[in-house]
């Protein structure tokens, strides 16, 4: 009986130490395609300032599909084939509809998301993947996880 209790206590101690070590490593986790695929994120911040969607308006978003297909909407709908390497997301040749939006912020967001995807955006996840941050030296966009299902 003592051997069983001693074994269980040792197992718990080893497990606790291993768990603590992995939590410390989460801050340095390099985001992978698997972390992003099949998720939809809605915009919450632009360059550190909170973004609120207008009443009855669609929330600007970015979604990652199978094989890193990227789609979303700011003012216009956009889409492209993403590639994630060493925590940097790129999508060359992003396609985008070209409608005019009366909201100047949404028009600027079209340019910002296009620039981030075309030139490469550093990708990070916070709060267990609930917050997605895309950034470069000019722009930081923060999104909140809001999956369709």
What function would you assign to each model-found segment?
Residues 17-79, 83-149:
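Lipid interaction determinants
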Residues 1-15:
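Sec-dependent bacterial lipoprotein signal peptides
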């Amino acid at each position: 009986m003592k051997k069983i209790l001693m074994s269980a206590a040792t197992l718990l101690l080893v497990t606790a130490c291993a768990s603590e070590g992995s939590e410390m490593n989460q801050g340095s986790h390099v985001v992978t395609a698997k972390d992003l695929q099949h998720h939809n994120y809605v915009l919450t911040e632009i360059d550190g300032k909170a973004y609120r969607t207008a009443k009855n308006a669609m929330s600007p978003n970015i979604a990652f599909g199978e094989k890193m297909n990227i789609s979303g909407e700011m003012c216009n709908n956009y889409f492209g084939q993403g590639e994630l390497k060493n925590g940097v997301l790129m999508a060359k040749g992003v396609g985008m509809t070209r409608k005019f939006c009366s909201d100047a912020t949404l028009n600027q967001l079209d340019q910002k998301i296009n620039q981030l995807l075309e030139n490469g955006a550093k990708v990070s996840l916070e709060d267990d993947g609930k917050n997605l941050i895309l950034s470069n030296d000019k722009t930081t966009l923060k999104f909140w996880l809001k999956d369709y299902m």
